[in-house]
Amino acid sequence: MWAGTWPTFHATILRSLLRVVLEHPRMARGRLFASYLSRSRHITSSVGSIGAAAAVAKILGLSVTEIAHAIGIAATQVVGLREMFGSHTKSFHPGRAAQCGLLAAFMAEGGYTSSDRALEAKRGWANVVGATKPDVQQNLEKWLGLEDNTVGLARDGAGRWEILRNSFKPFPCGIVVHPVIDACVRLHQDLATIGLVPSNIKTVVAKVHPLVLELTGKKEPQTGLEAKFSVYHGAACGLLFGKVTPAEFGNGVVKDTRVISLRDRIDAVISEKLAADQATVLLYLDNGQVLERHIDHAIGSIEVPMDDASLEKKFVGQCTPVLADGVKRASDACWAVENFQDISSITALL
């Protein structure tokens, strides 16, 4: 659809696109409501279509009324059950959310209408999606500046940009597992330093935030998709291989007897004292030693971001199977995206 709409994607459109990439997280503001949504819903689906609609509406240059209708059309399509985590359908959620947002904006552009109070009305998004959390409505009003007629957190001039709260993920699995994986990768190195190997591990205790087991508590994953939601698998791979890349979530690795053996020796224990981005991992070794690593902020977090070299390594590692010798050219082009006059110069490399 993009290729058909803009055969030549010029710099003016590219600048608009980059702007909405920066702005639409403010419009969607999923993080504000995450703790208030029903525990059975996937936040990416529940909020993503609204953010996508706002972003596309911005690119299309829709009027205020049309944007309101686009948001309404998107809001009525929200979907996503957390029961789907560990299956292909989990990845369907963000794709469907983006599709719904795109469709909503084009429908609004064509004159299709919706309620202009789709978010805040009594039977609107906030009160339906957050039906069991009465504070959702209040937080929405605060975010939009409706509560006391002040400049809301999402308004221009508020000085808050959600893009600055995003970061790049080093590990291809649930973000709540990252502190544990970070600790285990470091412990893998600690073992090597003292001349020991993972087979010297008797038991492992991972102290984690309650959300870790709620979201990633699959003790015996059977597939790579299920393993992405298993703190046990992530920890085992970090300890065994000293890295956790897409390869470690292959079905073969999930069935690897070494991985299963170590996974079975890992005990994840909830600690109310830990924040969601913290973890403590203890290794009890066969010689009586105990190694410990505590993570306050995992690699890839806002506080400890991936550096450019790590990002380059991740890009090359994941894209080489597809782009082969062209991966370096594509990487260089992505780093210099703001200098391109025509986005097709980049897409031609992909």
Where are these regions (language model features)?
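Conserved phosphate/anionic-ligand binding catalytic regions in large, soluble enzymes, centered on
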Residues: 1, 45-48, 172-176
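Active-site catalytic microenvironments for nucleophilic, acid-base chemistry
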Residues: 2-5, 59, 183-186, 190
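Glycine-rich, mobile lid/loop segments that gate access to catalytic sites or pores
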Residues: 4-104, 110, 115-124
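Terminal-appendage/accessory-domain detector
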Residues: 86-100, 106-350
